[in-house]
Each structure stands twice: as C-alpha cells, then as structure tokens.
Amino acid sequence: ASTTLTPVSEGDDPAIAVASEAKPAAAADLSTAGAAFGEETLDWMHFSDNGASPVSRANGTAINSVRFDAGRGFSDYVALSWNDGDTEASNSGSTNGTCTPGSITISVIVTPDTKHILLYTGAWKGTNTVEVYSQGGSLIHTAQSFSGDNTSNRQLVTLNVDAEESGVLVIKINLSNEWDDGSNVSLAALAVTGNSAGTAADAD
C-alpha cells in the first residue's frame, strides 16, 4: 500500500512526500540498501542478537538516536546482512531484532541529499502505526497502519524525504489494539539512503 501526501511547509523542516509499505524480501543487504533507488547508503543500524547492543554502519552520521520504551529480542525477521558495520564488521544474514510492548522513537538527521528512510518493522498481536514529526513536534505524516495476529506481520516501510535544508525528523513506531500482554511492535533495522555530498571529492 502507498500513501501520497502533499509536502507540508514548515519553514526549514523537511517534509515527507510519500510513504509506502511492502512485504520485505526474504533477504536484504543493509550496506547496499540505497542501490534499489540508484542511491548510496548513508547510514544504517541493526538491532541484532536478541537484545544485544545494536550494530551501526561504520562512520554513519544520519541516525541520531533510537529508543525503545522497553525492549526484548526476537529472531524471526527476514535475513539482513551487512559488510561495513562498526562493532560487528559483517554478517551474512541476521534474522534478529528488538520488539517492545510500547513505542519506538527514532531521530534522524536529514539534509537535501537525504532521499529515503527504510524501516524494517513489524507487529505481533497488535497494530503498528508509523508517525513522522518535525523537530519542532509537528506531525508531518502518518503511514498506513498494519496489524499482526499470531503470526508476525513484517513490513518494509519506506519514507521518501524532501528536505530543502538540513533538519531532524522524529519517527515514532506506535503499538495499538493490543491482544494481550505479549503484543508488540518491532524494529529489526533501519537505513538512510541518498546522495553522498562527498562523493565527487572522494573520487578525485
């Protein structure tokens, strides 16, 4: 499913033009997540190893912070790999992630070169709703909600970013319509893609 939104003018705050949701492929490479759009991967973070510290892209600077209200591990997401991590240099396909019975709050620094934010997220025994806010707290976009029953519903939520100037987006993944105490929303990974400002200079 996809939702088209007229960009919201909020001074220098970035706007979200389109949000789409789709079943993720059985496997994906976070290091090359931007290739599907003809872009570079600017940053990524993976919440792996059943609740252990997350693995980040080495030298990544776009993902400012990620906070789970309360987290526990799971191991049934699609296989996500990488080859440019910091604390774990490479992984051939981790299916782990972190889930919470509350909400997940993500802060991402965006610039005019930022084009997409990819959320590898899910829901189990409840409903997942992704909301995007400006740095000042204004709601910019609400993605289409999706629900999971006794089988986890895994989705790749893609946010198309339109930022005229640098700023911050705050993304919240919220749980609602809980079935029982085990209901949760999850985040296995996220990636930020776009055009690297230093590409041309680095090529010289």
Show where each model-derived region lies.
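Boundary/junction segments of secreted and surface-exposed precursor proteins
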Residues: 2-51, 197-204
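Non-catalytic accessory regions used for complex assembly or targeting
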Residues: 11-27, 46-51, 55, 103, ...
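Surface-exposed, low-complexity/disordered Ser/Thr/Gly/Pro/Asn-rich loops and linkers
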Residues: 61-107
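Short beta-strand/loop motifs in extracellular/secreted proteins, especially
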Residues: 78, 102-104, 115, 126-130
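Contiguous ligand/interfacial binding patches
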Residues: 99, 122-195
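Generic recognition of flexible, low-complexity loop/linker segments
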Residues: 104-108, 118, 158-159
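Extended extracellular/luminal ectodomain segments enriched in beta-structured repeat modules
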Residues: 110-118, 166
